[in-house]
Amino acid sequence: ASYPDNIKSGIPRASAVLILNDPQTGYPYALLEGALISAVRTAASAVLGAWWLNGQNRHAATLSIIGGGVISRNILETFVADDWSFDSVGIHDLNAESAQALAEFGEQLGLPDVRLLSLEDALTADIVVFATSAGEPYVKGQGTFRPGQIVLNISLRDIGAEIIEESYNYFDDITHCLKANTSPHLA
């Protein structure tokens, strides 16, 4: 479940509950808070997708992360753990403190040339990752992205319908992506 106002209270925006069941009896034997598990899974799927879309190559000149939250932190960590290399990494978030914190985290991970970028500049990277909680599309207009650019739309609603319609789209869960007014659903 997602509760964006939780952040104002200093608690995570998202929460989930996982129940582990005994494979023999089906009875539950563990109840886990699953937000971290979900974040790690989301990051792993994003980085795996980037690897396939990038021709099984773990290098890109530029990476931009749009959104400075937990998912973005996990995505940066996963890129590093998977031995990716970048010449520079750009960070953008509407909240300057979140952007700065993610940039500092990227530097701690050893990523090179980590810098804060405007949205316009962030959209020019070779790999662009959206990981925000935007309620409606704010990146709009045909021709926003160039051919061959990899855009990982981890978020639900950052990208306008016209961009989705002019792009090659790959979905890991079509049913999930085509509901709740997500960018693909709106297209």
Labelled PLM ranges:
Residues 136-138, 159-160, 178-179:
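Short glycine-rich, flexible loops that bind phosphorylated cofactors or substrates
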Residues 82-106:
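NAD(P)-binding Rossmann-fold cofactor-contacting core
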Residues 41-62, 70-82:
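Short internal alpha-helix immediately C-terminal to a glycine-rich phosphate-binding loop
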Residues 1-39, 47, 187:
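N-terminal ligand-binding/catalytic initiation module
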Residues 83-84, 142-147, 162-165:
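Short, conserved loop/helix-junction motifs that constitute active-site signature segments
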Residues 110-125, 140-142:
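Short acidic low-complexity segments
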Residues 164-187:
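Adenosine-phosphate binding glycine-rich loop
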Residues 127, 135-155:
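Rossmann-fold NAD(P) dinucleotide-binding segment
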